Amino acid sequence: MLKNFTRQLFAQLGRHLPRRLVQRDPLPDARNLASAPIPDSLGKQCLNVAAMDENEIWRAFSSHPEGLNEGEVAQKIAQYGENQIPAQKPSPWWVHLWSCYRNPFNLLLTVLGIVSYSTEDLFAAAVIALMVGISTLLNFIQEARSTKAADALKAMVSNTATVLRVVNEQGESRWCELPIDQLVPGDIVKLSAGDMIPADLRIIQARDLFVAQASLTGESLPVEKVTRTRDPLQTNPLECDTLCFMGTNVVSGSAQAIVFATGGGTWFGQLAGRVSEQESEPNAFQKGISRVSMLLIRFMLVMTPIVLLINGYTKGDWWEAALFALSVAVGLTPEMLPMIVTSTLARGAVKLSKQKVIVKHLDAIQNFGAMDILCTDKTGTLTQDKIVLENHTDVSGKVSERVLHTAWLNSHYQTGLKNLLDTAVLEGVELEPARGLAERWQKVDEIPFDFERRRMSVVVQEQDNVHQLICKGALQEILNVSTQVRYNGDIVPLDDTMLRRIRRVTDTLNRQGLRVVAVATKYLPAREGDYQRADESDLILEGYIAFLDPPKETTAPALKALNASGITVKILTGDSELVAAKVCHEVGLDAGDVVIGSQVEALNDDELAELAKRTTLFARLAPLHKERIVTLLKREGHVVGFMGDGINDAPALRAADIGISVDGAVDIAREAADIILLEKSLMVLEEGVIEGRRTFANMLKYIKMTASSNFGNVFSVLVASAFLPFLPMLPLHLLIQNLLYDVSQVAIPFDNVDDEQIRKPQRWNPADLGRFMVFFGPISSIFDILTFCLMWWVFHANTPEHQTLFQSGWFVVGLLSQTLIVHMIRTRRIPFIQSRAAWPLIVMTLLVMVVGIALPFSPLAGYLQLQALPLSYFPWLIAILAGYMTLTQMVKGFYSRRYGWQ
């Protein structure tokens, strides 16, 4: 029966420990985004809608060109609901406070406190209550400061949309500005530059419409949207050129579109809609500290009954033995672990906040230090998410100012909405040359862009009798209307040989990840009247302008620093492999063999896990491909970070041990992340890694000290209990000693850390902790036994009448040795000489040691059942402590050479 009870107790503790020790639930957190794949039915629906003609669209969504009337809207709202994404509600403060309290250590101490109170040991009960209260309140305060309850999904889209509705019984239609939650399937929406897409839409009218959907697909350049699909065989809904998806935005142009999905039925809604349905799994930090904590709790649960049995049997007073065993249990419980962990992590968060980094989840600090693989999106994360003019060359690939200035005139004089490429061209010419071009050349006319021609032209003049037509557009479309080429300053025919040369140059640019636009000209006699499309013929190909989304300035040094810190960087992007490989080259990463999304789809988990370990660049990935790769790398035993800024990154951010987002990220990505970088510099990543390793090292100091001290103390108690006719220390003494020791450890979060402890990723290792206990615990027991001998034979405290002297002597030795151990095992070096603790820790340990020595001489000595120690005791005390420190240093040297030092 006892065996079953113990098994059930361990099961309960193990079930609750991973999340409740450091991470509170259920605070509002987009990390709970469901990882379930997008349903096939939704993908098929999108593809069907994309292929429909206009009449089929009206029938499918029970709509009509005049818009919906009030009755139809009410019916559809009843059928489909409001256009809202489900969001998780923040928990009230008292639920958060309760979750801060209910970790296994606090629950265990509460039970011990109740037992102490029921036995009228009020002091012990008060001390335990103080420990539990401090730990709980500190956790609550620190996490309340660190966690911001934000409704990311509601902030994801714009507040209103322009909708065509029937406004009266006569059937009169009017464009209305309505809140987006009132949109229903079948509504007709007007789009213009700058608008966020308020629902999933099918385009029915479009003029020069470009939509930025990098947040969904990772593609850095805006994509064209048209009324009739150019690719009827398209199988990826996100690449359908007749569909727009919620959460993306219009870059340029205008359109009318019909709503075909709203709220949780949208593509974005499927990614985000299961926020409250699934609980995120414990990350590496939670799993590690769970295993370590269970080791310490098991040790306490095993040793306490042994102490009870030995004392009860040898002393014959089972009640006194029970009280003593209870005090031992309190002493063996690492009650300060939650507070030390939280305060250490919180200090790291405060230090990072000075670097303009928001730490939303405290355990992310340690995961930063443990991370050995960083997977990162490309667009907007490593890159500037801004199109710049990278090259301007003639047809042979040589840099050409003529081509640049010609392209500038085209972009400058067009009257349509300028897209990102035009903006990049205009910014590519300095102010003075641009002013000179504008003064020399006057606009005559233009031929606007359309998607059939995929080019646009302006006509300018420098002399009264000559006009120049400048045409800019997609390479193939320009070649279709060109007959000549400007080559080495001469005008030559565009023959097959020249065409092969052109292809070689442009293919090279494409392989470099550049988007190539061709520029051509034509000289015409001056004339009156408008120019037409037919004038775009017999053009002279001048050269090319090529564009790129460049890396941030800090990307290359940041990735180099991460690599030097033992972290492997992998790129996971939805963009093309050519563009991604170019960025990898720019930032100093060897892309190697690129793996694309279709390959990921074809592999099973074992094959993909093996491939993921040796692959640096993954391209053309869907959101769930990224999540799958991150999950499989975690399965292989890695601590994985993911850095991204788009909707398509949210599942991977949630799946990673540490999610990192950057400035300018969409709200859903910021909410899914644990860490948010508020500045463009990525160098703070290195600082975060170092801070994570520093906090881990300081947490490990407390755990090592607690584990080794507890092991040694229990061994000493067992030896003393077996041979002494009285208790080696009263329960009250154990509680006071434990309280003073805990006070000395409050300064651990402020301690220094040796350089070698932050060079490589640091992880929890329960096996190493167990070995550490066995090596260092008995050292203190050796000197405890020497103290027993000293008090018994030298000071003759060997009868029950003299037990107070015996207990006072061991109280001082035990407290001082336990307090000094922090300086011995906080470093593998020689303490105080090669490595010195931070001043707060030195001051706290000195203070506790002074208090411990003074208590037997203080007015409280009688109440505490201590007595003044003879002066001859103190030389022995110094010798014992010196011997203890010397032997510990010797064992430490052997241990670090044999097993290493965390």
Where are these regions (language model features)?
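Alpha-helical transmembrane segments of multi-pass membrane proteins
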Residues: 99-118, 132, 136, 158-159, ...
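Helix-interface capping motifs at the ends of transmembrane segments in multi-pass membrane proteins
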Residues: 107-127, 167-170, 295-333, 346-356, ...
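Non-lumenal N-terminal regulatory segments of integral membrane proteins
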Residues: 1-184, 189-197, 202-210, 214-221, ...
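Hydrophobic alpha-helical transmembrane segments
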Residues: 119, 127-158, 165, 281-376, ...
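Membrane-embedded transport module
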Residues: 307, 338, 345-347, 591-642, ...
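Soluble-to-membrane junctions at the N-terminal ends of transmembrane alpha-helices
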Residues: 82-114, 147, 234-243, 274-302, ...
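Cytosolic catalytic regions of ATP/NTP-dependent phosphoryl-transfer enzymes
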Residues: 243-251, 367-541, 547, 560-561, ...
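Basic, amphipathic juxtamembrane/active-site segments
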Residues: 210, 217, 227-231, 384-404, ...
